[in-house]
Every structure is written in structure tokens, then in C-alpha cells.
Amino acid sequence: MKFKNVAEELEFSQKRYKIKNDIEKLFIEKKYINYETNLVEDIKEDYLKNLQFKDSGVVKVIGDDGRISILSRDITTNLLNKLIPNWDLNSKAKLFYYGKIFKKDNNKIKEIRQMGVECIGLETIDSDKEMIDLIDSIMKNYRNKYIIEIGTSEYLKGILSEFYLDEVEYNFIINLINKKNKEDLKKYMKKFEKTPSREALENIIDMRGSIEEVLIKVEKYYTNQKMKKGLEELKEINSYINNEKIDSENIICDLSITSSLNYYSGLMFKTYYEEANKEIIKGGRYDIDSDGYGDIIPAIGFSVEIDEILRNLYKKGNI
């Protein structure tokens, strides 16, 4: 963000500090503890590099001895790389963090402030509900009109599991869904005519609305166990939203969310302020197979773009 003068820049910095403290106070009230991660990661310790970060946007640092390190590009990954090797299945942690991540963009290094929470080792549905509560509390603290977009990775992954797709086919379908290209998706799926979940996939783009509306829409389509698991998660969340008096006007359910689909293992969410196209909060469930033998550690979390909150408030004259 460009400033007219030093006073304006200092004011922006002070307001950023206040927002950070407000959110930190909320996390502490919910019994989260602060955890600090490193700015520099050893690439050999990256347990999740094959899941979420195949892009070329990472910033590499080459030492005098030729050893390659990476400037932190995601605090969650950095945090897990440090904690999971020593984790036992009875451990539990509610953590919050504040730090910087770095991404390469058009040969420039972009520095991004990131704040967030991770809930690791705790009961799945309870931590899902707590995430929704925290997200809603943060968003409504700054604006009345906002969107919390909720989905579940399990529904779409369940659909796709029926097709036995190769990588090219999989990526082509995901790309069509991302572009909301229903017409070409239907044409492409004709070759899978006998697959039970074909019709659900052809109509996945239309599975958007309130959680109640979406749950009604999916009733007429084939569902396998994985798809049902995702829908049951949404029912639980919908019941929680109604009971806790979270304003359902701000909630949109979208079963066609595909971002980092292979990384997530359940609830997914992202938030926006009205008339803004950049995410404020994003995250979801990413249960971890800690040893490769099926011992699963439940985990869910989200990150908050504090500077994006500030930019949005300044743009609207709300701050």
C-alpha cells in the first residue's frame, strides 16, 4: 500500500498493531497459546512439500556450502515440520502465531504478514465448530457485511474417487470446475457415462447456496461413503450455526471449492468482505498421517491476512 506521507504510514502501522492485538486477545480468550516458528526452513525437513507447495513461488536461499534453505512460505507447514516428528497420539495443542511468509512473484520477493491458529490432536467436530466461531468473531468485529464460504473436501474427493482418473484427466476436470465451466464439464464427462457419480460431478458447480439449500440439492444424486462423510460434517456445522445464532445470511456453502483439494481432509473455508475479491481468512481440516501407517492426528486451522483487513477498511472509509 502506498502512503502520501510518513504520518499516514505510521497511522497505518498503528492500526495494524491494534487489529493484531484484537485478534490475539480473542485467541487467548479461547485458550490458544502463542507459538513462534522460524523464518528459514531446511528443505529436507519439509514433510508436506508434496502436498501443498508444488509451485515455483518459493524463495530459496543457497548457503556458502551449497545447502539449500527456504524462506518460510507457509507458517502452518513450518509449525508442523517442527512439532510432528516428536508428536505422540495423546498430545493436544491449541496454537496461534504471527509472522511473515515470503513468496516469489514475477522475480520479486513478496513479504506477507500472516496470523492464524492451529488446533491439533483435538476432537474433530468440536474443533470444526470452534473454527467457525472464531472466524465469525473476527469478521464481524470489523464489518457487518461479510461472506464465510464453507465447503468440504470429502464430497468432491468422494465423487472423483469413482472415476479412477489419471493426472491429466484429474487436472482437466478440476480446471473446468475452477472456471465454473459447466457446459464443457458435461461434454467431457460423457465418456464416463456408466460411472454412478457422473451426474453429481456434472452439477457440482450448481451446489452453492445456504447449507440447507445445498443439502437439499445433493439428495437426488448418488453418494458413496466419502461423500456422505462430507455431507454429515456440513449438517453438524449447520446445526451449530443455527444454535449459536451465527448470522446465516453471511454463510455460503459451496461444494465446488477445489483449492488445495488434496491437502484438505474435511471442512474448508474462506472469507471475504462485501465487494472485495481477496480472501481475508482461509483454512480447513488437514488431518495428518503421522507415521504413514494410518495413525491419524486430527488438525484444523486458518490464517488471517491482517493487511487485507486494513486495506479493505481504508478503502471503505471504515477506519
Model-derived segments and spans:
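Polyanion/phosphate-binding surface patch
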Residues: N38-S69
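A short alpha->loop->secondary-structure connector
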Residues: N90-S91, Y142, D166-E167
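Positively charged, Gly/Ser-enriched RNA/tRNA-binding surfaces
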Residues: F12-K31, Y35, D42-K44, G57, ...
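A short acidic (Asp/Glu
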Residues: K157-E162, Y264
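Acidic, His- and aromatic-enriched active-site or binding-groove loops in soluble protein domains
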Residues: G57-G63, L165-K187
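Short, surface-exposed recognition loops or helix-turn segments adjacent to catalytic cores
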Residues: K145-L156, I173, I252-S256
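Auxiliary tRNA-acceptor-end handling modules of aminoacyl-tRNA synthetases
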Residues: M1-F12
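Short, conserved phosphate-binding/catalytic loop or strand-edge motifs used
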Residues: E111-M115, G151-G158
